[in-house]
Swiss-Prot record:
Pathway(s) this gene product operates in, as recorded in its UniProt entry: Cofactor biosynthesis; biotin biosynthesis; biotin from 7,8-diaminononanoate: step 2/2
Species this chain originates from: Azorhizobium caulinodans (strain ATCC 43989 / DSM 5975 / JCM 20966 / LMG 6465 / NBRC 14845 / NCIMB 13405 / ORS 571)
Family: Belongs to the radical SAM superfamily. Biotin synthase family.
Highest taxon in the source lineage: Bacteria
Assembly, per entry: Homodimer.
Gene Ontology MF terms: 2 iron, 2 sulfur cluster binding; 4 iron, 4 sulfur cluster binding; biotin synthase activity; iron ion binding
Lineage, opening ranks: Bacteria, Pseudomonadati, Pseudomonadota, Alphaproteobacteria, Hyphomicrobiales
Catalytic activity: (4R,5S)-dethiobiotin + (sulfur carrier)-SH + 2 reduced [2Fe-2S]-[ferredoxin] + 2 S-adenosyl-L-methionine = (sulfur carrier)-H + biotin + 2 5'-deoxyadenosine + 2 L-methionine + 2 oxidized [2Fe-2S]-[ferredoxin]
Cofactors (names): [4Fe-4S] cluster; [2Fe-2S] cluster
Name of the protein: Biotin synthase
Domain Radical SAM core: 43-262
Length: 325
């Protein structure tokens, strides 16, 4: 589906989504929890850990990102990590209870010369019994084939925001560029991890249009990360950031669950700003995945000890790893 088609989504569908969002909270939560229980174990939460394998120096100008070479954020550019160093971090993640190991590189697109190392990382992490996910930027079909052959389970490539708001966030690529890569990933047999970010000055309508865009992908993404933008000095978005109301975020999670019943909905960046009570509401609304570990690329995350206490308080248990066959 192109961005042009997404931008002209049927008004009736948009009205239905807004009507869901505006339901009295108890009714919205009841509907979302019912759908969630129809497809998932309501007491199981997926745990993933994210490692930046190549930080900073990205040529894209994404207004929310600390790793863009266009912004003065104090993030130093690094080279691609050695394979063994990545595998050492993956072992630590597994020992700490993570079921999926996600690796992110600050590239517009990977160079073919880097693919051998990335594929070795994927194969090595998979050999540890962990699910694998990478986010490397835009891909060619040939690169997708290499990642698939290495055993990659998931590829993350977010749509970021609504089609209408997208040009305000970045100018070095289009939403159609993102959707093209998602098409390559899907055609290559790799599961899709695709979500977005809220709190960048967008409207409620933009947030819901983003969910409509995700729900319009056929099939739905297997994994949908929902991020709350974390303030980063030196980024353009810092000038018009908006703190997301926790209840508004809970509503967004519930609508995501209703629109994409079989997708795993992940509480991603910004989760550390939510109280335990707000996170509990998110789980009731249908969220069933979290990032563990103290950092997400270059931004803070929940402390591991706080996560363990929270899951225990709520009676939730980490889901086991399920690498693709």
């Amino acid at each position: 589906m192109s961005a042009a088609i997404a931008a002209t989504a049927r008004p009736a569908a948009e009205m239905r989504t807004r009507a869901l969002y505006d339901l009295p909270l108890p009714e919205l939560m009841f509907r979302a929890q019912a759908v969630h229980r129809a497809h998932f174990d309501a007491c199981s939460v997926e745990t993933a850990q994210l490692l930046s394998i190549k930080t900073g120096g990205c040529p894209e100008d994404c207004g929310y990102c600390s790793q863009s070479a266009h912004h003065d954020t104090g993030v130093a550019a690094t080279r691609l990590m050695d394979v063994e160093a990545v595998l050492a971090e993956a072992r630590k993640a597994k020992a700490a209870g993570a079921a999926r190991f996600c690796m992110g590189a600050a590239w517009r697109a990977p160079k073919d010369r880097d693919m051998d190392a990335v594929c070795a990382m994927i194969s090595g992490v998979r050999a540890l019994g962990l699910e694998t996910c990478v986010t490397l930027g835009m891909l060619t079909p040939a690169q997708v084939d290499r990642l698939s052959a290495a055993g990659l389970d998931y590829y993350n490539h977010n749509v970021d925001t609504s089609p209408a708001y997208y040009p305000r966030i970045t100018s070095t690529r289009t939403l159609d560029d993102r959707l093209e890569t998602l098409g390559h990933v899907r055609a290559g047999g790799i599961k899709v991890c695709c979500g977005g970010i809220v709190g960048m000055g967008e409207t409620i309508e933009d947030r819901l249009a983003m969910l409509e865009l995700l729900a319009g992908l056929d099939p739905h993404p297997e994994s949908v990360p929902l991020n709350m933008w974390t303030p980063i000095d030196g980024t353009p978005v810092k000038a018009f950031e908006e703190k997301v109301d926790p209840i508004a975020f809970v509503r967004l999670v519930a609508v995501a669950r209703l629109l994409m019943p079989r997708s795993v909905v992940r509480l991603s960046a910004g989760r550390h700003t939510l109280s335990d009570e707000a996170q509990a509401l998110c789980f009731l609304a249908g969220a069933n995945s979290i990032f563990v570990g103290d950092t997400l690329l270059t931004t803070p995350n929940m402390e591991e000890s706080r996560d363990a206490v929270l899951l225990a308080r709520l009676g939730l248990r980490p889901a086991p790893a399920q690498p693709s066959a």
